[in-house]
Amino acid sequence: MVISLKNRNFLKLLDYTPAEIQHLIDLAIELKAAKKAGCEKQTLIGKNIALIFEKTSTRTRCAFEVAAFDQGAQVTYLGPSGSQIGHKESMKDTARVLGRMYDGIEYRGFGQHIVEELGEYAGVPVWNGLTDEFHPTQILADLMTMLEHAPGKTLPELSFAYLGDARNNMGNSLMVGAAKMGMDIRLIAPKSFWPDAALVAQCREIASVTGARITLTESVEDGVHGVDFLYTDVWVSMGEPKEAWAERVSLMTPYQVNQQVVNATGNPDVKFMHCLPAFHNEHTKVGREIEMAYGLKGLEVTEEVFESAGSIVFDEAENRMHTIKAVMVATLGD
């Protein structure tokens, strides 16, 4: 079956079929191999790409820029203080302006409705670099990384547990990705931090077709047993006030990924994943504040696990670039 994603937006995985998602992962694997071998073919020569960042970023910005440059495209970075978007000009108007000047647009910001509006009116492919609800490019990288570290297996044969704040964009997106690809996902969190019930129902409906297994539980021991991968994210998301830390730390500490949790999987080959940045020690400004306030040297993951042989977080981070490149090539490439 020939799959063409030409001129498609990439706003959320719910918009894509399992075959289309697998196509993007396969393309990313091919592009990664070509780059390593020094034989990458450029398909974006002469293309101009706008990168809209209403939230700051390291990995997403670098991934989009390097991917674009590798493929021969030019980029314009519009940072949080470098444009009139939402202040003097609506997103609808911005979309129609940028769509006349650029061949593709990336957006990283707040509400999902904003990137959806951008995608509706731009007239060129729009890619979601992160919103409060979804982070689809991260999930492509995660699925690619899982396949790399489970040779000979397909995604429906893999299981993973996500611990922590499961109602954030990562919890949402991992659940959607697992549902679409027929995987076994366990979301382990306090019940008040489970994903929105409507999204859970939507994912369960998808799972009834794909064969995915979706488990929501408060029990760490039950949830992690037998999984291939452990996954976590920060406990306080971008944009949330510092005042939220105390309550969040109290609620989330039982869900920290530590050696005890690794042992509870019963899988000596279990791998650890994190979308980064991670609070795993006191070597950052925030890390020092956390240690002073709560006496903790790590939050969602301990230094021991983060730096262990089973940690594949930097493979995962690298794959952000390869999967983002795949999205741009598939939707915009010649």
Swiss-Prot record:
Q: Which residues bind L-ornithine?
A: N169, D233, S237, M238
* Annotated pathway: Amino-acid degradation; L-arginine degradation via ADI pathway; carbamoyl phosphate from L-arginine: step 2/2
Quick one: which residues bind carbamoyl phosphate? S57, T58, R59, T60, Q84, R108, H135, P136, T137, Q138, C275, L276, R320
The UniProt entry lists the main location of this chain as cytoplasm
GO biological process terms, semicolon-separated: arginine biosynthetic process via ornithine; arginine catabolic process to ornithine; citrulline biosynthetic process; L-arginine biosynthetic process
The reaction(s) annotated as catalysed by this protein in its Swiss-Prot or TrEMBL entry are:
carbamoyl phosphate + L-ornithine = L-citrulline + phosphate + H(+)
Q: Please name the InterPro entries in this protein's record.
A: Asp/Orn_carbamoyltranf_P-bd, Asp/Orn_carbamoylTrfase, Asp/Orn_carbamoylTrfase_sf, Asp_carbamoyltransf_Asp/Orn-bd, Orn/put_carbamltrans, OTCase_ArgI
One MF term from GO for this chain? amino acid binding
Question: Could you tell me the EC number(s) of this protein?
Answer: 2.1.3.3
Q: Where in the cell is it found?
A: Cytoplasm
Gene Ontology CC: cytoplasm
Q: Which family does it belong to?
A: Belongs to the aspartate/ornithine carbamoyltransferase superfamily. OTCase family.
HAMAP family (UniProt xref):
OTCase (MF_01109)
Matching NCBIfam families: orni_carb_tr, PRK04284.1
**What role does it play?**
Reversibly catalyzes the transfer of the carbamoyl group from carbamoyl phosphate (CP) to the N(epsilon) atom of ornithine (ORN) to produce L-citrulline.
Q: What is this protein called?
A: Ornithine carbamoyltransferase, catabolic
Organism the protein comes from: Salmonella typhimurium (strain LT2 / SGSC1412 / ATCC 700720)
